[in-house]
Structure formats: C-alpha cells, structure tokens
C-alpha cells in the first residue's frame, strides 16, 4: 500500500482506499496458481408430455463437456479423452447405473407432475400493438412494426396482411425475447411502401387464445389525418361547451328553486 500525504483528510482517505483496492487487484493478478471450473448439469427432455422422456447427466471441465450419462444409451459415455477413465470406472458400478436409469421416472416424470400446472399448462395472453417505425408521408419506404409482448408459452405465430392478402416477402422478426418473468416478446416487421387507403393487419395466433388476434393499421394521407384530427378536436370542443352550458343551466335552476310565490305551502 502506498500512502501519499495530501492536504485534507477526506482526500487522503479516498486516495488510500483507492490504492488499497488497486494493490489488492495487482496482488491477485500476480497469483499464478491454476484455477478450474467444474460443472454438472442434469437435463430432462420431454416429448409429447411424459410419453417419452430422456434424462441427461452432463459433466463439464472449464466449460468443455467431457462426460455424460444418457438414458437412451443406458450408461456413461466419454465426450473427450478426459472422461474416458471416469466412464469406464462408473460403468463398472452396476448399482450406480441402475440409479441413473431410474432418474427417468423418479426425477424427470416426478418433477413434470409437480410443475405441470404452472409451467406446461400456464397461459398468458399476448398484447399486440402496430405502429410505423418512421413518421413520414405515404408512398415512401417504411417499416410497420407488430409488437407482441407479455405472452406465455413461447410458441406463437405472427402474420402480416395487406388488404386481406398475406404478405410473406419483406417480413423480418427479432425472434423470441425472454423478459425474465416467464413471459416473452417479439417484434415482427413488414417492409412496405404504404399507399393511401391500404389496410395492414397483424394477425397473432397463440395457445392462450381460441381465435386469432388481429390489429389493423390504416394508411392515411396527411390531409386525411388533418381532417380526422380536426373532427376529433371539434367534437371534444363541442363536448366542453355542452358541459359548460349544462352546468350553468342547472346552477340557475337550483337558485330559482328556492324562490316560491307567496301563499304556497312547501
């Protein structure tokens, strides 16, 4: 550790801590002792539920697989030369092999039954939105984006249609993206040149819905969009005036209700 005397106690302390961290890292970097990473990975592969199950017990050394047990084979097999003596030794132990073969039922099928309700049977509806990647006039090259998010399981089919006809050319996808919360998302984009009056539809099929989800995007010219916005603005303004008029009317009615002609009983 190197300590330099500088004015100001806090600066000296900060510099001292920094130098201590640096010196510890340098000391660690100077340690030339070999380090190894050993990893064991157990896998269950299911086909058509539990109709066919495959169990794998895999062993890795420094991220390289060197040995595995495969229930389809029934014994250990060396993947590299490093695993050959281990495979020969373990294959000679009949009790160990019987135990590993039994993992298909007492490990894989058992855990499938425990987790089936919240894994295999889990269903979450997708959320679908459609929008252009760029805001620009019609008859210019653009990218229409169909965003499908928050769905489970990951099996999904997304299609693009233009005026009712499926578009296959110019369709690109990000593929499945894991959200980290047991849901997925994907973006499926259509390269096209939108023209006024055209209707683009993104159709999504997913196990969580009984019928396909469809979201439309209509190509409108700037003048049509301006007219639509003007119409919406006029409608909202009319509602505001109507609300203000009704408020004034009912307030006046309430004020007059307290004045009654002489002689009437209330």
Swiss-Prot record:
Where in the chain are disulfide-linked cysteines found? Answer: 44-108, 146-202
Give the location in the cell.
Cell membrane; Endoplasmic reticulum membrane; Lysosome membrane; Late endosome membrane
- Could you say what the effect of mutating residue 87 to E is? In allele DRB3*02:18
Q: Which GO terms describe its biological process?
A: adaptive immune response; antigen processing and presentation of exogenous peptide antigen via MHC class II; myeloid dendritic cell antigen processing and presentation; peptide antigen assembly with MHC class II protein complex; positive regulation of CD4-positive, alpha-beta T cell activation; positive regulation of immune response; positive regulation of T cell activation; positive regulation of T cell mediated immune response to tumor cell
Membrane spanning stretches: 228-248
**Membrane-topology descriptor:** Single-pass type I membrane protein
Effect upon mutating residue 68 to S: In allele DRB3*01:10
Assigned GO CC terms = autolysosome membrane; clathrin-coated endocytic vesicle membrane; endocytic vesicle membrane; ER to Golgi transport vesicle membrane; Golgi membrane; late endosome membrane; lumenal side of endoplasmic reticulum membrane; lysosomal membrane
Could you say what the effect of mutating residue 41 to T is?
Answer: In allele DRB3*01:14
Q: Which residues lie on this side of the membrane: Cytoplasmic?
A: 249-266
Task: Spell out the SUPFAM superfamilies in the cross-references.
Answer: Immunoglobulin, MHC antigen-recognition domain
Listed result of changing residue 40 to L: In allele DRB3*02:01, allele DRB3*02:02, allele DRB3*02:03, allele DRB3*02:04, allele DRB3*02:05, allele DRB3*02:06, allele DRB3*02:07, allele DRB3*02:08, allele DRB3*02:09, allele DRB3*02:10, allele DRB3*02:11, allele DRB3*02:12, allele DRB3*02:13, allele DRB3*02:14, allele DRB3*02:15, allele DRB3*02:16, allele DRB3*02:17, allele DRB3*02:18, allele DRB3*02:19, allele DRB3*02:20, allele DRB3*02:21, allele DRB3*02:22, allele DRB3*02:23, allele DRB3*02:24, allele DRB3*02:25, allele DRB3*03:01, allele DRB3*03:02 and allele DRB3*03:03
Matching SMART domains, A to Z?
IGc1 (SM00407), MHC_II_beta (SM00921)
Q: What is its main location?
A: membrane
| Glycosylation, residue list | 48
- Annotated effect of mutating residue 57 to N: In allele DRB3*01:05
Region annotated Beta-2 sits at 125-227
Q: Which residues lie on this side of the membrane: Extracellular?
A: 30-227
**Record note on what altering residue 66 to N does:** In allele DRB3*01:08, allele DRB3*02:06 and allele DRB3*02:20; requires 2 nucleotide substitutions
Where along the sequence does the record put site: Self-peptide antigen? 40, 90, 100, 110-111
Tell me the segments the record calls region Beta-1: 30-124
Q: Where is the signal peptide?
A: 1-29
- Quaternary state and partners of this protein? Heterotrimer that consists of an alpha chain HLA-DRA, a beta chain HLA-DRB1 and a peptide (peptide-MHCII). Newly synthesized alpha and beta chains forms a heterodimer (MHCII) that associates with the CD74/invariant chain (Ii) in the endoplasmic reticulum (ER). Ii is a trimer composed of three subunits and each subunit interacts with one MHCII dimer, blocking the peptide-binding cleft. As a result, MHCII molecules cannot bind peptides present in the ER.
Query: What does the UniProt function comment say about this protein?
Result: A beta chain of antigen-presenting major histocompatibility complex class II (MHCII) molecule. In complex with the alpha chain HLA-DRA, displays antigenic peptides on professional antigen presenting cells (APCs) for recognition by alpha-beta T cell receptor (TCR) on HLA-DRB3-restricted CD4-positive T cells. This guides antigen-specific T-helper effector functions, both antibody-mediated immune response and macrophage activation, to ultimately eliminate the infectious agents and transformed cells. ALLELE DRB3*01:01: Exclusively presents several immunogenic epitopes derived from C.tetani neurotoxin tetX, playing a significant role in immune recognition and long-term protection. Presents viral epitopes derived from HHV-6B U11, TRX2/U56 and U85 antigens to polyfunctional CD4-positive T cells with cytotoxic activity implicated in control of HHV-6B infection.
Query: Can you say what this protein is called?
Result: HLA class II histocompatibility antigen, DR beta 3 chain
Q: Which organism is it from?
A: Homo sapiens
